[in-house]
């Protein structure tokens, strides 16, 4: 799934791939179970990149990236009613790795669905 020549960003995606199929757990921050921001924080911390714990605060980390300039490893954020409620790790080709919701698992997901397109808030580069 990796695209581009972006060593640090690709390392973030490769690290996140280790946790595919881990169950979603509200408030989860370990490989026993992750919520969306717990996955992002765990992956980044394991690579020596410090990010905040919750998605709304993670949206303040790093530098802003335009959607048409996304690179693998960028953090992508989604909002509803002005509130950042979800974060994923951009994996390239319009896909992200994320922990979506209770009853689901860490997985690849297209960002091009109506749901994610309509709630896209922006992206941050933390590496």
Placement of each model-derived feature along the sequence:
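Aromatic- and glycine-rich peptidoglycan recognition patches
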Residues: 2-7, 14-15, 49, 91-127
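Short, flexible segments with low predicted structural confidence
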Residues: 10-16, 60, 87
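...with weaker cross-activation on analogous glycine-rich loops/strands in unrelated enzymes
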Residues: 49-108
């Amino acid at each position: 799934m990796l695209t581009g020549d972006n060593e640090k960003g690709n390392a973030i995606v490769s690290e996140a791939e280790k946790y595919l199929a881990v169950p979603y757990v509200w408030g989860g921050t370990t490989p026993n179970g992750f919520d969306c921001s717990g996955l992002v924080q765990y992956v980044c911390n394991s690579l020596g990149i410090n990010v905040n714990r919750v998605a709304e605060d993670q949206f303040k980390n790093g530098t802003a990236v335009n959607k048409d300039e996304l690179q693998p490893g960028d953090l992508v954020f989604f909002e509803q009613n002005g509130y950042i409620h979800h974060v994923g790790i951009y994996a390239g080709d319009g896909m992200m790795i994320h922990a979506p919701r209770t009853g689901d698992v860490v997985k690849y997901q297209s960002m091009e669905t109506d749901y994610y397109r309509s709630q896209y808030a922006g992206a941050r580069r933390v590496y």
